[in-house]
Amino acid sequence: SGSKLPRHKGSAHIGSVALIALAISLAGCAGLPDQRLANEALKRGDTVTAQQNYQQLADLGYSEAQVGLADIQVGTRDPAQIKQAEATYRAAADTSPRAQARLGRLLAAKPGATEAEHHEAESLLKKAFANGEGNTLIPLAMLYLQYPHSFPNVNAQQQISQWQAAGYPEAGLAQVLLYRTQGTYDQHLDDVERICKAALNTTDICYVELATVYQKKQQPEQQAELLKQMEAGVSRDTVTAQRVDSVARVLGDATLGTPDEKTAQALLEKIAPGYPASWVSLAQLLYDFPELGDVDQMMKYLDNGRAADQPRAELLLGKLYYEGKWVPADAKAAEAHFEKAVGREVAADYYLGQIYRRGYLGKVYPQKALDHLLTAARNGQNSADFAIAQLFSQGKGTKPDPLNAYVFSQLAKAQDTPEANDLATQLEAPLTPEQRAEGQRLVQQELAARGTLAQSTLQLHALQEEDGEESL
């Protein structure tokens, strides 16, 4: 992407020439920072080289390089770096439509964002869309679907229908997203298929949606045809490895239909050497279908994933030591692996909380358990609320707290499992009407802090381009 410098009449040309001369004198010809090289390094996953190049260009005032730098910060998923990225995008947003889009997407996906931030996100995304930026309508739709109370005058379905009528390419996917977030996907499989067949050549996330549709409809012939098309796209570089990984995960998901784990394994084996995240997908597949390999194979996959700093590999390895099925149970080893994944994988906090709550390290650590479980719950880990309710009701290593136990058992009812519903009923019985009213107030307060449809932020991430220049 070309660098956009602020334009000043008369001095624009001289200014940019002077900056380039300065860059050469600063870096010497051989080490000249290069936006294109930085973009390519980012696509290869070489964030160190990309960061060095972007940093030098950003220091010279190139707004697009500032955006690239912020993209890397967002990619770390480290809250402190994401905060920094927000400031960087904001600084570049006046001159860079790309920064407007990025900041809009960041604010739309920000946990616990204020109503003012929701409105700022809306205005930025609309502005970026008007400036020709892609991937702006999907997060805008997400904003309307996830925070209806912030936009009481917007009817999401009506808005999406208008976009479709205007022929905007992203409108179809926004419709698919609406089906997903409102739980009506299965009733609209034909519509999802129609939308995604039409958008397949321009939007490779549609391979994932179509694979899902064909699994749910039990249509192996169409699925095979789709995979053939996808492989052709991979060889032409029009389909990313990340998409192939997602499609393989769909094929290996027994909740969608009859799984085809062997095809999933073959797809992942092919891309893993160049796309390390797939080593972990292979390990997960093996975990779900143990007949595909043995413990040595599992460890090979996970070692490859860990060598490429994949937090999902640490999470899965921690899980193996936590459960003790593939390897002997070892709470200390599990804790060490989960700690490496904390801040990057939500479930790591959940498992650490369970280790501390259940006393797997020799004694119960109630405060540590609560800290981790609450973090997990607020980041969308459903089962964490149930574990917190148990922590407060059982009082292991701490005094029982009936009110808080009630609050989190009510939140856990969202899981809709017999255990969660039974616990909620059991904890509600001894409370006075005043305590129940106070409990319900606290439930609403906690839900407001989390934002509605907390899970759908995951959908937003799933629908974002994660490769190179098009990351968040």
Where on the chain are the PLM-derived regions?
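Hydrophobic face of amphipathic alpha-helices that form TPR/SEL1-like repeat modules
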Residues: 68-75, 104-110, 140-146, 177-181, ...
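Post-signal-peptide N-terminal segment of Sec-exported extracytoplasmic proteins
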Residues: 36-87, 98, 135, 139
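Short helix-capping/linker turns of helical repeat alpha-solenoids
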Residues: 60-62, 76, 95-97, 110-111, ...
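Bacterial signal peptide processing site
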Residues: 30-32
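Structural signature of tandem alpha-helical TPR/SEL1-like repeats
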Residues: 45-49, 77-88, 113-124, 148-158, ...
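Short, low-complexity intrinsically disordered segments enriched in A/P/G/S/L with frequent Arg
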Residues: 1-6, 10-11, 15
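Terminal, low-structured helical/coil segments at or just beyond the last alpha-helical repeat
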Residues: 419-472
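Alpha-solenoid helical repeat scaffolds
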Residues: 55, 90, 126, 161, ...
